[in-house]
């Protein structure tokens, strides 16, 4: 299904003094400093997003980047690679949730530049503790369980940092799937504004 969807990516034609040039729609949006995080956050997806962030920084280190998020989450380490890059680069990263930002995707949403984190009205956010299948001999299970707890502590700290909630409150909320509407995510501090309509298109 996903391969079929990728085969349906539209192309746009641009006219210039040198003639016509065609772009797939995502490459065209990248020219306007727009990046999409779509679907599960895997190592491959994280690599692509990080590469685009670094490329846009090299093009203009002073101009904002817009990160549109519609994702159920994914691998914690992959998500943290994107998160760390967002915090590391010079341009401020504006985050916009459409559809959903769940699990690690919610960390990326909250990690946008202060005052520049948005959610569309019908979107939702979900936070929960990291999870993973642990198997093997007892010593390996213990090591993996400790790593899961370390990642949980790390994500709690990041949510607390960006939302203004206490770590105790975030820890309590993350014990189970914790769903928030766009307005609730705004009240919680994950986003700053529920975006209704903008006056001028960026593209």
From Swiss-Prot:
Record-linked InterPro entries: ClpP, ClpP/crotonase-like_dom_sf, ClpP/TepA, ClpP_His_AS, ClpP_Ser_AS
Keyword Translocase found: no
GO MF annotations, alphabetized: ATP-dependent peptidase activity; ATPase binding; serine-type endopeptidase activity
Keywords assigned by UniProt, alphabetized: Cytoplasm, Hydrolase, Protease, Serine protease
Reactions catalysed: Hydrolysis of proteins to small peptides in the presence of ATP and magnesium. alpha-casein is the usual test substrate. In the absence of ATP, only oligopeptides shorter than five residues are hydrolyzed (such as succinyl-Leu-Tyr-|-NHMec, and Leu-Tyr-Leu-|-Tyr-Trp, in which cleavage of the -Tyr-|-Leu- and -Tyr-|-Trp bonds also occurs)
Record family assignment: Belongs to the peptidase S14 family.
NCBIfam families linked to this entry: PRK00277.1, PRK12553.1
Biological role stated in the UniProt entry: Cleaves peptides in various proteins in a process that requires ATP hydrolysis. Has a chymotrypsin-like activity. Plays a major role in the degradation of misfolded proteins.
Subunit structure: Fourteen ClpP subunits assemble into 2 heptameric rings which stack back to back to give a disk-like structure with a central cavity, resembling the structure of eukaryotic proteasomes.
Protein name: ATP-dependent Clp protease proteolytic subunit 1
UniProt source species: Treponema pallidum (strain Nichols)
Taxonomic classification: Bacteria, Pseudomonadati, Spirochaetota, Spirochaetia, Spirochaetales
């Amino acid at each position: 299904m996903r391969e079929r969807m990728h085969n349906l990516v539209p192309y746009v034609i641009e006219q210039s003094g040198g003639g016509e040039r065609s772009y797939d729609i995502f490459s065209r949006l990248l020219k306007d400093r727009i990046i999409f995080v779509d679907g599960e956050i895997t190592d491959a997806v994280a690599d692509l997003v990080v590469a685009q962030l670094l490329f846009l920084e090299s093009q203009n280190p002073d101009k904002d980047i817009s990160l549109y998020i519609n994702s159920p989450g994914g691998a914690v380490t992959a998500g943290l690679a994107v998160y760390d890059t967002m915090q590391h680069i010079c341009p401020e990263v504006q985050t916009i949730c459409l559809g959903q930002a769940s699990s690690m995707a919610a960390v990326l949403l909250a990690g946008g530049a202060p005052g520049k984190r948005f959610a569309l009205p019908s979107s939702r956010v979900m936070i929960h503790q990291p999870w993973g299948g642990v198997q093997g001999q007892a010593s390996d299970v213990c090591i993996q369980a400790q790593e899961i707890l370390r990642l949980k502590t790390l994500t709690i700290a990041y949510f607390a940092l960006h939302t203004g909630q206490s770590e105790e409150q975030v820890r309590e909320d993350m014990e189970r799937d914790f769903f928030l509407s766009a307005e609730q995510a705004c009240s919680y501090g994950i986003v700053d504004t529920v975006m209704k309509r903008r006056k001028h298109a960026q593209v």
